[in-house]
Amino acid sequence: MAKKRGDAPAPDPIPQKAARKSRGAAFAIVIVALLFVGTFGWWKIAHRDRSPAASPIQGAAQSSPAPASTSQPKPAPLLPPLLEPEAQVFARYAGSQGCRECHAAQFELWAKSNHGNAERLPDKVMDAAAFSPERTFHHGTQDSVATLKDGKPVVKTLGFGGAHERYPITRVIGHDPLRQYLVERPGGRVQTLEVAFDPKRNQWFDVYGDEDRKPGEWGHWTGRGMGWNAMCASCHNTRLRKNYDGAKDTYRTTMAEMSVGCESCHGPMKAHVEWRKQHPQTKEADPTVQKLTRDQTFDTCGSCHARRRELTGDFVPGDSFAQHFQLTTVDESDLYFPDGQIRDELYEYGSFHGSKMHTAGVRCADCHDPHAAKPRVMGNALCLRCHTGAPGQIPDSTVIAPIIDPVAHSFHKADSAGAQCVNCHMPVTTYMQRHPRHDHGFTIPDPLLTKEHRVPNACNKCHTDKDTDWALSATEKWWGDKMKRPSRERAQTVAAARAGTLTSGVPLLTLLRNEPNGYWKASLIRLLGAWSADAEVARAFLEYAQHPDPLVRTAAVQALESIGGPLGDAAQKVLARRTEDNERAVRVAAVSALRAVPDATSRAFRELMHALDLAADQPMGQLQKGAWAQANGDTAGALAHFEKAVAWDPNSGGIRNEFARLLSGMGRAEDTLVQMQEAVRLEPTQAEFRFNLALAWNEAGNIRNAVREFEEAVKIDPRHARAWYNLGLAHSALGKAAEAVTALRKGEDAEPRDARIPYARATIHARLGQRADAREAAQRALTIQPEYQDAQQLLRQLGQ
């Protein structure tokens, strides 16, 4: 039935994803975004999409997408492998023992270090205390036993099939402060026990505390979340090849050397060892050795000490980080606090990349002895090597660090905890119950950010008996206006963007223009993705896609995927050029963002497929492959991957939510509802899941249940504009005009840039004979979107 002018907008289904078009950087982080079909769903389901509407039906301002592709990339002809065969690679490695003769001092430091003991075989001396005498220990609701059987270590614990069994220990990872023990399984799998040993306390414990994980869960030690092959091996060994066979779901994992050997950081050195043997007396430099730059060394550290997406599974020292990884930065998630402090397990590289120290030219080896894997100097003396005003401490840098007197600067007594630089600027977070790690973001403690946005501050971490106001009063007294610094403004803006309280992208765009640090530029670009429909923001993405920093280019390229309108063609041209970028991270981002089906023989496409296959042993990897298949018209393939992801991690609400989107697009309303009900059961406080469940209920024809879930969504997230809008339409459909108007006004407050919300309200006012209110709402819609034809027609009917 044709809709009459002035009628309330019909609750339109979300159009299915066309021509692999999705928003923002979703693919790089999780998956290529999918669309969820629901009678009320006029917005793409993505967390807090704040893009303004450009048309009354189709959603955020975007160019008209090409028709959905039903063709598949042509099978690639036989081409050289992307990775060199491992036999050829491993033949270039000498092993750490080959370095000992000439580099004895460095070797001895390394052999005792956490790197030297990153992974090893069980040792009768080193592991004696853990297994003899027999120990029984309690964790959660479980009891486990560590003992020796025939002189070899075993652990009896809750394992496969829910039974307590004895598992022989075949390897050990970690050294200080904890050691984890490995169990070999069929299919080349190696699993990491969740019970670990603390050698200093001489105590067994569970790395997950009292979470009490059980068999069948992804994160239980028997699950994929504790699989050594995928989760541990690459950073505990030298030049590892995971060798996952997706067809058989098996591994053939190999490595050049067990543990983090010399060549993990220096690269393959067999040619050097042989050259030195042939030239024992010469003082000439070995022509086979490549001396790494400071940034190459930094990227080598980052290859393991970073939260990142792996693209190759084959990093080698000397290569750039961006040739092998896409770095996790501050974004809309809660992995980082808004000021850049770590919240989740993020390691050091990312935080340090965003620090003033990195911008000033400091690199890892300036502070850390790379062979001992410990600080070069302990205490404040390490920081004061630079912060005395003396130049020349940082090679190749003209930056002179500000002079710091620890007592005068900290307002704490000499040698007290509060006068230690690291306690304020590198606060500690403990992971795995026993592993304290310093934050490498070198942030400034700011109780105001604690009060406003719950960002932790070092003052209250120490002074646990004092409140935030006490700490805030002290910092304002001691430092006054110095606290009003750019990093505070940045943190406040990031927090506002995450909370959905920014009414435009201008504050973020201003910060982006003025930010000197590439890491933070990339972070701000990712946060700006919600405003990609704004022409100024889109032009910024086009500009920064050419930035010299690959981290910035990657973020900008990912953001270009959502650009439509007049700049859509320009965005696609830039993406096409970036598929030939000199860094793989950018190429992979670009080819995944292009609308056109890529050439299966192109380097960028093959690299993307390799990255997808590399992650295919994990549920999220299957989700990525499924999303790619669905985006390219292979619904059957997508379904197979999504079903596998759910089977591998049945307790993930997020995976079930994504699966529901696919099922909805296939018209399987009943199955969609089942998956969304399960997602909400697993994670009942996720507003987006409640919203999607409401859409699923409506697809099933139960509008009253849909209303209930929309209401739950806005209780959890009062700024969920899509939920308010759809709640308003649902109330209107039930004849509850007053409730509909109230909900739509809430939606306008939450998203003041979308013209459809006030237009929907205008139609309800008009139907009720409230002409003045109808004119006001229609006029508001036209203020937002002057070309909105339905609103123009309604105003004419109302006699403007």
Question: What is each residue range found by the language model?
Answer:
Residues 63-67, 71-83, 88-90, 105-174, ...:
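Primarily the internal scaffold of c-type cytochrome electron-transfer domains
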Residues 534-536, 567-570, 601-607, 632-644, ...:
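Structural signature of tandem alpha-helical TPR/SEL1-like repeats
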Residues 531, 547, 563, 581, ...:
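Structural marker of alpha-solenoid helical repeat scaffolds
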Residues 550-553, 584, 619-620, 653-654, ...:
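Helix-start (N-cap) detector for alpha-helical repeat units in TPR-like alpha-solenoids
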Residues 502-512, 533-546, 565-579, 600-610, ...:
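Amphipathic alpha-helical scaffolding segments comprising HEAT/armadillo-like alpha-solenoid repeats
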